[in-house]
Curated annotation (Swiss-Prot):
Pfam families: Ribosomal_S19. The keyword Transmembrane does not apply. GO terms for cellular component: cytoplasm; small ribosomal subunit. Belongs to the universal ribosomal protein uS19 family. Protein S19 forms a complex with S13 that binds strongly to the 16S ribosomal RNA. SUPFAM superfamilies: Ribosomal protein S19. This is Small ribosomal subunit protein uS19. Keywords: Ribonucleoprotein, Ribosomal protein, RNA-binding, rRNA-binding. It comes from the Bacteria.
């Protein structure tokens, strides 16, 4: 479901603060964030965020195509190791 227009996009206040500080300083360090639910705004384009996936911070470089999506979409939390193979084919 899409968030209603009158509410506007959700962005953590601390995240906005960190992004503004990074823009003002001109440094391009990785900004560590834990807010996977925050929406990517146009002012974040060009910055690199370390999005926490439960184990580590995954670096996400924001580009124009990502605007409007959530940070959590670009930092997978689960790894798929494949389904169990056929025991008959492994035995022979």
């Amino acid at each position: 479901m899409v968030r209603s227009v009158w509410k506007g996009p959700f962005v953590e206040a601390s995240l906005l603060k960190k992004a503004d500080a990074a823009r003002a300083s001109g440094r391009h360090d990785v900004i560590k964030i834990w807010s996977r639910r925050s929406t990517i705004l146009p002012q974040f384009v060009g910055l690199t965020f370390g999005v926490y996936n439960g184990q580590k911070h995954v670096p996400v470089s924001v580009n124009e195509e990502m605007v409007g999506h959530k940070f959590g979409e670009f930092s997978p939390t689960r790894t798929f190791h494949g389904h169990a193979g056929d025991k008959k084919s492994k035995k022979g």
